[in-house]
Amino acid sequence: MGITLKNVSYTYQAGTPFEGPALFGVDLEIKSGSYTALIGHTGSGKSTILQLLNGLLVPNQGSVEVGSTVITADSVNKDIKQVRKKVGLVFQFPESQVFDETVLKDVAFGPQNFGVSKEEAEALAREKLHLVGISEDLFNRSPFELSGGQMRRVAIASILAMEPDILVLDEPTAGLDPSGRKELMRIFEELHRAGMTIVLVTHLMDDVANFADTVYVLDKGRVVKSGQPAQVFQDLDFMESIQLGVPKITKFAHELAEKGMNFSHYPITIEEFKEILHG
């Protein structure tokens, strides 16, 4: 299942003295089975797009097509609820997403809310908690007693338990140590390989290079560049002009080029750089 935004604009508190335009005529396509990254500086519109993807917000103008469901300014709650089941959104701050008495109840809540029996919901919860690396001895603990990294995993499991077609991730590894970040990114990559559509918002350009097949660059509420990461990251000057930059190895290759080394194109991963050196 994919998502298409057509000429989408959004203004917070529209029609009031406090209105704040956030998006302007955005066109964007997330293809079924893709791993799409959305990148942009603070205030670029990334978070607004994420909330539009799963119906937390509806566009003031334009449409958001999720599979066969079309969301516009006039959409009814029935359509929006279906979108929320298909598109799972993991917020950047997990404490805003967990709430129940125990870890197991928290993860089982979502499936039950969509009509799954208590027994089946608990089975799904156990499966997804194991998937994200939460051990059974934590199942009956309060989620608020967990570490930040564990709480993040519980929040992800609670979304996966609803078995969405699309997983939307807002800075999913923020605040994690390197090993925790690597493990979570591995889980997302496995989900993608199994056929799930992934949408990733991140400030880490190396993650975009290593995992995404498509990237959209946002600036001041508009899409200013899009394409494959290998294409987008060739324009180092532009990416730095909007305070994003490029992967570390791309920056390093650019510095080598300034010292006389020839590149037909700048590598975006370490593996690609090795191939160029040995090619």
UniProtKB/Swiss-Prot annotation:
SMART domains: AAA. One of its GO terms (cellular component) is ATP-binding cassette (ABC) transporter complex. Keywords: ATP-binding, Cell membrane, Membrane, Nucleotide-binding, Translocase, Transport. The keyword Nucleotide-binding applies. It is found in: Cell membrane. One of its GO terms (molecular function) is ATP binding. It holds the Pfam family ABC_tran. Its EC number is 7.-.-.-. Forms a stable energy-coupling factor (ECF) transporter complex composed of 2 membrane-embedded substrate-binding proteins (S component), 2 ATP-binding proteins (A component) and 2 transmembrane proteins (T component). ATP-binding (A) component of a common energy-coupling factor (ECF) ABC-transporter complex. Unlike classic ABC transporters this ECF transporter provides the energy necessary to transport a number of different substrates. This is Energy-coupling factor transporter ATP-binding protein EcfA2.
